[in-house]
């Protein structure tokens, strides 16, 4: 587990054994990083298999879900022309597919991600529940999804017996939620609802620290009395 609160960085790369693979779905990595404006991207703390030059892109051997909760940036892949990604959007990455993404320097961004593979997810993709033709999904700000990423990080860090099976269940929960929310347009909340979700996410990210209510109100551009 690598954690650097000064950078807003936390991630875990997991060891997968033969028994984990028999389950049909396993997780290789899970993480969170907050990239301030005018910062290099990606951060160099990642292993060589994951670190990449955003100008050249990369090809992974796994699926990934990358959820943006703050800021904006750009994404492109073999099947997707360059598109803007902003808070509330989720990128789906596929194994063997070239892709690249990065935050805009003037905004930075906050991302949550989880990487996984296995025949279980292959079957889900083969049946077109997830598609390379639709790699950017509109989710909106969703505190429940952020909580699932946080739970996955906690499970990965504890690394107890059957942690991989626990993590696989979290991935399936995420996929089910993502499909439901994006297809039913549940993300189309009012501005007030979205600010409430954003406040929940900020408090979730600062669960071990103190969140000043007045400062939080200023960040959300609302009055403290509201």
Protein language model regions, located:
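Short, leucine-enriched amphipathic alpha-helices that occur as contiguous helical runs
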Residues: 62, 192, 196-200
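Basic/polar phosphate-binding segments, predominantly the helix-turn-helix DNA-binding elements
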Residues: 177, 198, 204, 209-226
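Amphipathic alpha-helical segments enriched in hydrophobic/aromatic residues interleaved with Lys/Arg
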Residues: 15, 123-185, 201
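Short acidic-glycine-tyrosine-enriched beta hairpin
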Residues: 79-94
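Generic protein-terminus/edge-of-domain signal
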Residues: 1-83, 105
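Ligand-binding loop in jelly-roll beta-barrel domains
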Residues: 82, 96-119
């Amino acid at each position: 587990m690598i954690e650097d609160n000064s950078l807003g960085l936390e991630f875990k790369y997991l060891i997968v054994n033969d028994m984990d693979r028999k389950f049909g779905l396993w997780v290789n990595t899970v993480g969170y990083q907050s990239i301030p404006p005018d910062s290099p991207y990606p951060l160099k703390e990642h292993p060589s298999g994951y670190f990449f030059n955003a100008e050249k892109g990369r090809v992974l051997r796994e699926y990934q879900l990358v959820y943006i909760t703050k800021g904006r940036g750009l994404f492109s892949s073999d099947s997707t022309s360059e598109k803007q990604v902003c808070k509330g959007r989720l990128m789906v990455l596929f194994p063997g597919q070239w892709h690249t993404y990065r935050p805009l320097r003037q905004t930075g961004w906050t991302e949550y991600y989880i990487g996984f593979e296995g025949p279980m997810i292959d079957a889900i993709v083969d049946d077109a529940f997830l598609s390379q033709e639709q790699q950017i999904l509109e989710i909106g700000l969703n505190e429940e999804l952020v909580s699932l990423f946080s739970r996955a990080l906690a499970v990965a860090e504890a690394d107890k017996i059957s942690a991989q099976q626990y993590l696989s269940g979290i991935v399936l929960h995420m996929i089910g939620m993502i499909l439901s929310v994006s297809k039913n347009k549940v993300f189309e909340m009012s501005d007030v609802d979205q600010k409430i979700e954003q406040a929940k996410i900020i408090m979730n990210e600062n669960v071990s620290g103190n969140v000043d209510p007045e400062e939080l109100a200023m960040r959300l551009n609302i009055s403290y009395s509201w």
